[in-house]
C-alpha cells in the first residue's frame, strides 16, 4: 500500500503553521528597498490613500508552475487593514475591480471565439493570446491624508506572454500619470513593485 505524506484532512496541520510562520519571517528578507527618502518606515497605522492594480489583486507568484496552491493569500489591502491602516480609496479600488472584470470577460469571450474558429481547446489559445492587462482609472482627487501608496503589479508565466507595450513591460499612460499625481499631491508617496517579472520604470 502506498504511503501518503500530504495532509489527509482539511485541518491546518502543525507543519503548515510552522511553515507559514517561516514564510512570514522570510518574506521581509526577500523584498528589496530600492530608494528611501525617509518616508519608510511609516510612523504608524493611520489613514492612507492606496492605489494601483496590485492592491486587491496582489501577485503571489507567476502563472503556470510558478503558481502554487495555498489555503489563503493575503492581499496588500488585507495586510494594511490588519496592520491597522484605514484605506480611504475604496471607491477607486472598486472602479478598478470593474475595469478588470470587464477586461477579463472580454478576454474569455475572445478566447472562446478563436477556439471555436480554430477547432482547438480554449486552453490552447491562451498560449498565443495572453491576457492584456487594462490600464487603471485616473486619480483625480487627493484624499484626506499625507500618505499615498501605489502598488504596481505584473504577472507572467512560462510562455511568450510578455510584450513591450503599455500595461505590460511598460507602464500604462494612466499608471504614469497617477504616480506623478501622487508624488505632487502627497507629502509621502510609496511605490511598491509587486512583480513576477521585469518592468521598465524609467
What are these regions (language model features)?
Residues 1-202:
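C-terminal non-catalytic regions of proteins with extracellular/luminal or membrane-system context
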Amino acid at each position: 500500500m502506498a504511503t501518503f505524506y500530504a495532509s489527509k484532512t482539511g485541518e491546518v496541520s502543525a507543519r503548515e503553521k510552522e511553515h507559514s510562520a517561516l514564510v512570514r519571517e522570510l518574506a521581509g528578507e526577500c523584498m528589496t528597498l530600492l530608494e528611501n527618502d525617509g518616508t519608510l518606515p511609516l510612523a504608524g497605522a493611520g489613514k492612507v490613500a492606496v492605489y494601483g492594480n496590485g492592491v486587491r489583486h496582489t501577485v503571489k507568484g507567476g502563472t503556470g508552475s510558478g503558481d502554487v496552491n495555498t489555503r489563503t493569500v493575503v492581499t496588500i489591502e488585507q495586510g494594511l487593514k490588519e496592520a491597522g491602516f484605514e484605506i480611504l480609496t475604496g471607491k477607486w479600488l472598486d472602479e478598478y475591480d470593474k475595469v478588470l472584470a470587464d477586461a477579463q470577460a472580454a478576454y474569455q469571450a475572445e478566447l472562446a471565439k478563436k477556439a471555436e474558429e480554430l477547432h482547438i481547446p480554449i486552453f490552447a489559445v491562451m498560449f498565443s493570446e495572453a491576457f492584456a492587462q487594462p490600464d487603471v482609472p485616473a486619480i483625480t482627487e487627493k484624499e484626506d491624508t499625507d500618505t499615498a501608496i501605489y502598488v504596481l503589479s505584473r504577472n507572467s508565466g512560462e510562455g511568450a506572454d510578455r510584450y513591450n507595450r503599455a500595461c505590460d513591460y511598460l507602464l500604462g499612460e494612466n499608471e504614469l500619470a497617477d504616480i506623478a499625481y501622487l508624488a505632487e499631491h502627497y507629502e509621502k508617496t510609496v511605490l511598491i513593485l509587486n512583480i513576477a517579472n521585469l518592468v521598465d520604470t524609467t
